[in-house]
Design a protein with these regions (language model features):
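A short aromatic-anchored loop/beta-hairpin motif
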Residues: 2-112
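Beta-strand elements within well-structured catalytic alpha/beta cores of enzymes
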Residues: 12-17, 50-55, 142, 163-176, ...
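Conserved phosphate-coordination/catalytic loops
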Residues: 29-33, 92, 150-154, 232-235
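Long, well-ordered alpha-helical scaffolding segments within enzyme catalytic domains
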Residues: 33-44, 151-166
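Short glycine-enriched loops at secondary-structure junctions
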Residues: 56-60, 69-71, 118-128, 176
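Flexible, glycine/proline-enriched loop segments at strand-loop-helix junctions
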Residues: 84-92, 114, 143-150, 228
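Internal, conserved structured core segments that host functional sites
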Residues: 98-154, 159
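Surface-exposed, charge/polar-rich loops and edge strands
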Residues: 100-103, 107, 137-138, 148, ...
Length: 270
């Protein structure tokens, strides 16, 4: 069990936009603001004893935890330079924590399994390479649910609340805008009122003075938000936010609001 003795050892929860494939570590100009943000983010966090990542790039039929002691690498992107398929992030896994989380989810009637073979996908190894390049903090992943039900993902977060008094960093690794056809792959920041409307709605929901029940209901009904399906033709990059908010159950702080791949993206900290 992680350290619970110090009252300052509270879980930290963050949702951020992780960029396009390996581009953030290739000095891609359209990721400059994001890279700077991620490199400085640990300075405003306590050093965690473990990192749990809910990545947009892992979906399973039931909640699945990465259970490897020494996770391999899963290069889940295509068409990039050869060196991007040689990236390593040799952080240890945390099978004990995976087993404990599986127990928590099962106690909350969420069917769960552990995958001892799966490796780190780029939703983990790209941001953590920027944040914790020493790769010396145990890390693991929790999958999304393939049905992409927003209520189910809020429930995943609620089930994780038993970890709130432990020194763990929970990362929702997605993208607050994820329309592949609309990205500017040349990094040109162009006005996009439709995306602005959605990002502003998301900021209001996560940081505004509303009740937690209203906050959660708005996220359940996220498709009613302005330009929702333009910003998320498919919602796998948004749903890590639902897990984070379901776990935190409080108002977030906006910690990033800038351009990535020519589109505005945001990040929140609880």
């Amino acid at each position: 069990m992680l350290n619970q003795t110090n009252s300052q050892n509270k879980a930290q929860i963050v949702y951020f936009s992780h960029g396009g494939g390996p581009l953030p570590i290739l000095e891609d100009a359209s990721h400059k603001a994001m890279v700077e943000f991620m490199r400085h983010l640990p300075s405003r966090l306590k050093r965690p004893e473990a990192i749990l990542v809910i990545s947009a790039h892992w979906e399973e039929g039931i909640a699945t935890l990465l259970g490897a002691q020494t996770p391999t690498m899963l290069y889940d992107y295509y068409g990039f330079p050869d060196e991007t398929y040689e990236i390593t992030y040799p952080a240890p896994g945390s099978p004990d924590l995976a087993n404990r989380i599986a127990g928590l989810l099962n106690q909350n009637n969420i069917p769960t399994r552990i995958d001892p073979q799966r490796g780190f996908d780029h939703g983990l190894f790209i941001p953590l390479t920027l944040m914790y390049p020493q790769a010396d903090i145990p890390a693991l992943q929790l999958s999304l649910l393939r049905g992409l039900d927003p209520t189910a993902h809020l429930s995943l977060g609620t089930a994780l609340r038993a970890l709130m008094h432990e020194n763990i960093l929970v990362v929702g690794s997605g993208f607050s805008f994820h329309n592949m056809r609309a990205f500017s792959w040349h990094g040109i920041n162009t006005p996009d009122p439709a995306n602005d409307d959605f990002q502003n709605w998301l900021i209001e929901v996560c940081t505004g003075p509303i009740s937690q029940s209203e906050r959660e209901q708005r996220l359940i009904d996220w498709q009613k938000a302005p330009s929702a399906r333009y910003c998320h033709p498919r919602e796998e990059h948004l749903l890590p936010l639902h897990v984070c908010l379901g776990m935190a159950k409080k108002t977030a702080t906006l910690i990033f609001d800038d351009y990535i791949l020519g589109k505005r993206g945001v990040a929140f900290l609880w």
